[in-house]
């Protein structure tokens, strides 16, 4: 880390630890024998920062991690869920043709018998219905898999049963990763 970055971080730590000027300078004097960051070497600055961390300072990331690096369209989500279901063994054909047939069957019910023949042509409310229906199907498959393997359904830290799509898929992936479920 650069000298300037270390000095900035030390000053952030000073504010976080609520050190007044006299206490801060006494702290520097105790750790390095000097009363100003300007007089310190990079090694000494690192020592001061480490000492502040020992006193309770925690460096927080300025920006929290984001779920997606870029915007993912509903159409891409449908495609990824379809492929994940195939990878998990819930459907036998994870290809585009099978997905298009599913979309056509699903949209035919809503459009009075005439379905959208491919995912690429599906827009708006129809696309949202396809996405949400596919997520619910995937959740049902995950619940059945937990039951089939004799595992309890995952619960939140408060003890409530998980219901959200992201939480259920993460729990299923964790169960497979830890080999609690055969792949």
UniProtKB/Swiss-Prot annotation:
It comes from the Viruses. It is found in: Host cytoplasm. Induction: This protein is constitively expressed from the Pgem promoter unlike most other early proteins which are expressed under the control of the Pe promoter. Its expression seems to escape repression by repressor protein c and thus occurs throughout latency. Keywords: Early protein, Host cytoplasm, Host-virus interaction, Modulation of host cell cycle by virus. It holds the Pfam family GemA. GO terms for cellular component: host cell cytoplasm. One of its GO terms (biological process) is symbiont-mediated perturbation of host cell cycle progression. Its main location: host cell. The keyword Magnesium does not apply. This is GemA protein. Homodimer. Belongs to the mulikevirus gemA protein family. Disulfide bonds: none annotated. Early protein responsible for decreasing host DNA gyrase activity. Promotes DNA relaxation of bacterial host genome. Modulates the expression of various host genes probably controlled by supercoiling of their promoters. Host genes affected include DNA replication and cell division determinants.
């Amino acid at each position: 880390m650069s000298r300037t970055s270390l000095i900035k971080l030390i000053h952030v730590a000073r504010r976080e630890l609520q050190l007044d000027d006299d206490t801060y300078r006494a702290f520097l004097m105790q750790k390095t024998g000097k009363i100003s960051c300007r007089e310190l070497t990079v090694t000494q600055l690192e020592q001061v920062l480490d000492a502040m961390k020992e006193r309770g300072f925690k460096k927080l990331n300025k920006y929290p991690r984001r779920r997606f690096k870029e915007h993912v369209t509903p159409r891409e989500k449908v495609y990824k869920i379809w492929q994940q279901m195939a990878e998990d063994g819930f459907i036998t054909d994870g290809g585009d043709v099978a997905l298009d047939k599913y979309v056509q069957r699903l949209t035919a019910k809503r459009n009075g018998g005439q379905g959208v023949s491919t995912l690429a042509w599906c827009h708006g409310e129809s696309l949202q219905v396809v996405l949400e229906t596919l997520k619910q199907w995937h959740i049902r498959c995950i619940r059945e898999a937990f039951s089939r393997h004799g595992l309890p359904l995952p619960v939140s830290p408060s003890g409530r049963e998980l219901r959200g799509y992201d939480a259920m898929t993460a729990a299923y992936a964790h169960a497979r990763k830890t080999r609690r479920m055969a792949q």
